[in-house]
Amino acid sequence: MTPRELRADVPAFQESAYLNFGAHGPSPAYVVDAVSDTVADHEFNSGADDPYTTAFASYDRARERVAAFIGAEPEEVALTESTTDGINRIATAVDFEPGDVVVRTDLEHPAGTLPWQQLEAQGVEVRVVETTDGRLDIDAYTEAVADARLVCFSAVTWTHGTQLPVSELVDIAAEAGAFTLVDAV
């Protein structure tokens, strides 16, 4: 599906542009229809099928489609309620220990800062790579991640709209042995 095809499927886009997709936004008509059908089926046919079986089958199909789209295996895809939820799940899933290092930029949405602030109270060092006018200094980033356990940054920053060089930053983190968490909403 191309962006133009997606735009044609969203009734709200016929007369305007919508730019606030970080938190919510209008859906394609087929998404609204699918949600309506699911609610109606649950309300009127809940005795006919196990709703959990139906829901899990839907999750599995969605995971398979996302995996195919991004070139991953379905078991590598996690479906979360939001980016905030996903970041929090990762922050609590990694077994951080006192002295571990998490690196982030100063451009992050609160969802990309608050989990790490909580870990600071447990002895995890959080390094913030400062930027200038929304621009990231690659040398400063490389130095900051040298001994990091995890690096968290946004593909496109929410305050400046800066597009960070994701592939390069991921490669630098990988060379340092760090996990990378990219907010790519």
Language model: regions and residue ranges:
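Pyridoxal 5′-phosphate
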Residues: 1-185
